[in-house]
UniProtKB/Swiss-Prot annotation:
Alphabetized InterPro entries for the sequence: AB_hydrolase_fold, ATG15_Lipase, Fungal_lipase-type
EC number assigned by the record: 3.1.1.3
Principal location class: membrane
Catalysed reactions, as listed in the record: a triacylglycerol + H2O = a diacylglycerol + a fatty acid + H(+)
Function text: Lipase which is essential for lysis of subvacuolar cytoplasm to vacuole targeted bodies and intravacuolar autophagic bodies. Involved in the lysis of intravacuolar multivesicular body (MVB) vesicles. The intravacuolar membrane disintegration by ATG15 is critical to life span extension.
Family: Belongs to the AB hydrolase superfamily. Lipase family.
Topological domain ranges for the Lumenal compartment: 22-585
Name of this protein: Putative lipase ATG15
GO cellular component: multivesicular body membrane; vacuolar lumen
Any one GO molecular function term: triacylglycerol lipase activity
Subunit structure: Binds to both phosphatidylinositol (PI) and phosphatidylinositol 3,5-bisphosphate (PIP2).
Protein's membrane topology: Single-pass type II membrane protein
Length: 585
């Protein structure tokens, strides 16, 4: 461990830009040190905005006074209302977390993970199992209040407030539309400032590209919840990085680098938390959120060991395994869904395909909208309303909106569901992942078959089915040579029509053998080379010798009058020779 301590010490010597940038001189003390009440009222105190894509260094804070009027911009439109109040109950729970959770220490661990491409392994001395105060997820009013906190995105009525720069100003106030790009956090506090509820804004209501942060949410969704940056899947998925190697093969080091960039929601959430702990150093912090905001809330809770309650959150175990979060002793960093005592509770219902991890088919609304929702595993415990079985609902994206969840699910049920972990879940089981330096190109093997035809010479006498020139074809097993005595001058349909010369050497015929058979007749046939081929044989005249008929010798001459299609039309001459006469016995 000495080497690790030395590395951590060296990292601590350098000032991290994101840490220094999020320090705020504002500190709000705890007003009452009495034991924490079971039920408390929470009101909106601050709104924090952290830039991501266009202004990653932007960090602003808006303080809310009790008499401040707000525009409540919800999925059902905008309306004016006063600062809301919510009643929340608490109960103690156990959370397995780091003993030293200072922002600088945790950032050092994350920096080591970035450099080594693996999470830091710490001994049990660095960990503790704490009993902390957390929202009572068995109380319906508490669950309903937390859900309502996540439902609205509040904006100030023009002229009633001013955004302050948390970091030194970079003239972002003069940049039009800065408030539509980034991660928004709403800070609720009880009357004594002993407990703070951080609400992170999730995916915009519109599935397809539109106003607000919808496009940025899509990029973060596809980074967090796809197996490989929305690559290797459906055509409509929006690709957000280039880490795909081959079929179902992905470079995890490349994905980790993309997830940890400064313009991503996880990094923005870490910076928001850094500023919140600077403002409330002695307060107990809870985190909640809906959809993408719920997933980011869970990742933030796992990083710092915070109580988390989410609603219809996207399954977040996959990005948790890639962010380099320090795992407790005896746990697998690649399977955070198997961890116990995380302090995270995920509320959802069975008709929501995003919460259930099934919004990834070829014709699903998520896919058609460009979202690659391939993850299906949650960390912590699942608190699931079975609306499909109880109410006969059909699975649909319309049931994902938080307003419908509040009115049609949470308020409709008399009790909250029982929460339980699901540790046997597996993400991307058909993919292969490897570690590689991003600067080194991944070798790709391509097999190419080339067919080449080689002609030995130019054909001088083409025919109907090939070349009539004399050729020599060498083979490895046998050699066949076809030799023509002369070049064909008169090619025909099925061969050469040039006249040929055949020489026949007379040979004395032996005496026939007489066999006592009735009738004693023996036939011998002698045929020379066929000069007139026919359709089913040779049309040359044949000579047949039947004893005691004299033998016949046929002499052929070159054809002077060839036929129209085949054969020779010359007259043939036959010479008969008398066999030798033997004396009678």
């Amino acid at each position: 461990m000495m080497g690790l301590d030395l590395l951590v010490s060296l990292l601590a010597l350098s000032v991290s830009p994101c840490i220094a940038a999020t320090r705020s001189p504002l500190q709000i003390p705890v007003l009452d040190t009495q034991p924490i009440e079971t039920g408390r009222e929470f009101t909106l105190r601050h709104m924090l905005h952290h830039g991501t894509y266009r202004d990653p260094l932007l960090h602003k804070r808006l303080d809310i006074r009790p008499d401040t009027l707000l525009w409540a911009a919800s999925e059902n439109g905008e309306k004016r209302e006063s600062v809301p109040r919510f009643r929340v109950s608490s109960r103690p729970i156990n959370i397995h977390r780091l003993s030293d959770r200072h922002v600088s220490v945790v950032e050092d661990y994350l920096s080591i993970a970035r450099m080594t491409s693996s999470a830091v392994t710490l001994s049990s001395d660095y960990w503790t199992l704490d009993e902390v105060d957390a929202p009572d997820v068995t109380d319906k009013e508490t669950v309903l209040s937390l859900a309502k906190m996540t439902s609205n995105a509040y904006i100030m009525i023009p002229g009633s407030g001013e955004w302050f720069d948390v970091v030194p100003p970079f003239n972002h106030s003069d940049s039009f539309g800065w408030d539509s790009d980034g991660l928004r956090g709403h800070i609720y506090s009880d009357n004594t400032n002993s407990t703070i509820v951080v609400v992170l804004k999730g995916t915009s209501a519109a599935i397809f590209d539109g106003g607000g942060t919808t496009t940025n949410d899509k990029v973060n969704d596809n980074l967090f919840f796809s197996c490989c940056c929305a690559q290797g899947g459906h055509y409509f998925w929006r690709q957000v990085c280039d880490c795909y190697s081959s079929t179902y093969t992905c470079n995890t080091a490349c994905v980790r680098k993309a997830l940890r960039q400064e313009n991503r929601y996880y990094r923005a959430a870490l910076n928001l938390y850094s500023n919140i702990t600077a403002m409330y150093p002695q307060s107990n912090i809870w985190v909640t959120g809906h959809s993408l905001g719920g997933a980011v809330s869970s990742l933030l809770g796992m990083t710092y060991g915070l109580p988390v309650v989410t609603f219809e959150a996207v399954p977040e175990a996959l990005p948790a395994s890639r962010l380099g979060l320090p795992p407790p002793p005896g746990t697998d960093p690649s399977s955070p869904q198997a961890r116990n005592y995380t302090g995270a509770y995920h509320f959802g219902h069975t008709a929501d395909p995003i919460y259930m991890g099934t919004c990834n088919g070829a014709t699903s609304v998520c896919t058609l909208g460009g979202y690659a929702m391939e993850s299906s595993c949650h960390t912590g415990q699942l608190c699931t309303y079975d609306t499909v079985e109880d109410f006969g609902w059909r699975v649909g994206i319309g049931t994902h909106r938080i307003r419908e969840v509040i009115t049609d699910v949470i308020e409709r049920y008399d009790d909250v569901p029982t929460c339980a972990p699901f540790t046997e879940c597996v993400d991307c089981n058909n993919w292969k992942f490897f570690e590689s330096n991003e600067t080194t190109p991944t070798p790709t093997t391509t097999t190419t078959s080339t067919s080449t035809r080689t002609r030995t010479s130019t054909c001088k006498t083409p025919g109907w089915w090939g070349c009539l020139d004399p050729t020599t074809t060498p083979t490895t097993t046998a050699t066949t040579s076809t030799t023509s005595t002369s070049t064909c001058k008169t090619p025909g349909w099925f061969g050469c029509k040039d006249p040929t010369t055949t020489s026949t050497v007379p040979t004395a015929s032996p005496a026939p053998t007489i066999t006592p058979t009735s009738p004693p007749t023996t036939t011998a046939s002698t045929t020379s080379t066929c000069e007139s081929p026919g359709w089913f044989g040779c049309n040359d005249p044949t000579s047949t010798t039947t004893f005691p008929v004299p033998s016949t010798t046929s002499t052929s001459t070159p054809c002077s009058t060839p036929g129209w299609f085949w054969g020779c039309r010359d007259q043939t001459t036959t010479t008969s020779a008398s066999p030798p006469i033997t004396s009678p016995p």
